[in-house]
Amino acid sequence: MADLSFNDKMILIQYAIQKYENEAVLIEKLKTVLSEKDAQRGIDTLIGTQRVRRIGPEILENNVSHTELPDLPDHLRPIADNL
């Protein structure tokens, strides 16, 4: 698989959160595309920038009231669909 840019990883994680809100399930699904460290770092970055919020101990949610979900680029669509 081609290397993904930082922004591609953030967008992919946001779309994965839209599909799987449970953090443990989310990380397992993202492991097919990203390392666990990259997935966790991306989640932490998205929480820190308030694009994602934590609802309880295990649930993540896109913070669409704060920022819109970015458009999914065509080259990421097959990856996001296969998660």
Please place each PLM-identified region on the residue numbering.
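Minor-groove-contacting beta-hairpin "wing" of winged helix-turn-helix DNA-binding domains
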Residues: E58-T67
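Short, amphipathic alpha-helical interaction segments positioned at domain boundaries
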Residues: H66-L83
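Short amphipathic alpha-helical interface segments
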Residues: A2-T32, L83
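Short amphipathic alpha-helical interaction segments
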Residues: V33-G48
